[in-house]
Amino acid sequence: MRVDIEKMEVTVTVIVMLLSFAGGSNIGNISARSKNRGKGSMWWGIAKAGEPNNLSPLSPGVPYLDSSAYYGTLRRKQRRLARENPGLLDAIAKGAKMAIHECQFQFRNQRWNCSTRNFLRGKNLFGKIVDRGCRETAFIYAITSAAVTHAIARACSEGTIDTCNCDTHYKGRPQVFANGNNAAAVTNVRDFEWGGCSDNIGFGFDVSREFVDTGERGKSLREKINLHNNEAGRWHVQSQMRQECKCHGMSGSCTVKTCWMRLPPFRVIGDLLKDRFDGASHITTSNGGNGRNNNKGHSNRLPKHPKMNAIMSNSIHSKRENRRRLHKYNFQLKPFNPEHKPPGTKDLVYYEMSPGFCEKNPKLGIQGTHGRLCNDTSMGVEGCDIMCCGRGYRTQEIVVVERCNCTFHWCCEVKCDICRTRKTIHTCV
């Protein structure tokens, strides 16, 4: 009897060992995917697809952009959206580049300057700082989501996406005056007609949700934060739709006024998100898990003008997918300080403190502030005292060579002088 038991134990041990050898790699991959979920987005790499170091050699000395370079940064659902909406991927790539440019502009005078790397692996585009749930990561998610929304909405009105065009649902609606009153209560205000070509914010908002939020299930705390910050970026774009008008009439008169809705330059969105970054909401880590609460701070509403273009892909409109999509946004984040109100729809949220940016940290992709330019007369974040972290700074005089006194000569040439000026600069030691 004891021999049989020993044989059974040996058999079980061998089976377990075989299973571990056969499926160990898969188990490891699953755990790795679970660990890395919500930390960085591969699609960010689209912004670098056209960089020289990401081009393939067509022939010696003649590089070209392989079409697979774009698709290599995308998930299956994102590739499907790109196939079903020709022209969409170019708009998203433009949005990703806009996001990087705006992020670097907003933080140009701060210790963290939103530096990026020049390769296609999007998760590492901004460095490993996105592994932290800090304020800088919140801004990255919000600005990239906002830029994609802005770029898609504008691309629709420009006619560069085959499956969408101008937003025409304003036509036939009651006229809205700048002061919000009814026409009967307004004097000396000219009527207008809806016309022109409005930016399609409904399409941009919804497709941005489908594309940008792919892979974010909203189950863990980090995924909820990513979804919230992505939504915050989109709502900042949607809320900035503006009415533009053009007058028609003899001798500059405004006999007829035609109006349409248009998005502002993306700099306006960047400024708003930078303000939200400065006042970002610190949330508690007890927000994790699958609990769903009545959501008052985090809106499930679609855009103010949610009617989508009739020719948009049916896959985006499927009722089942719509219900599942809205369900993952149904949560309320709790503030770290119970006395503070919960974060609103447009607030940026974080749960980890930012790392130090004074010294170089290759692990997080932080460049440090050594060698950075600073302003010796400023008391702000760009001042040498703060930028250089108390290490001091060097002052040197350089000669700047630039074109000046440019004049236009008919036709068609611009001639400039070469000017040399001395300039004093300050760099952190």
Indicate residue ranges for each PLM-predicted region:
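Long, position-biased, composition-driven segments near the start of the mature protein
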Residues: 2, 9, 20-386, 390-429
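Sec-dependent signal peptide recognition
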Residues: 7-15
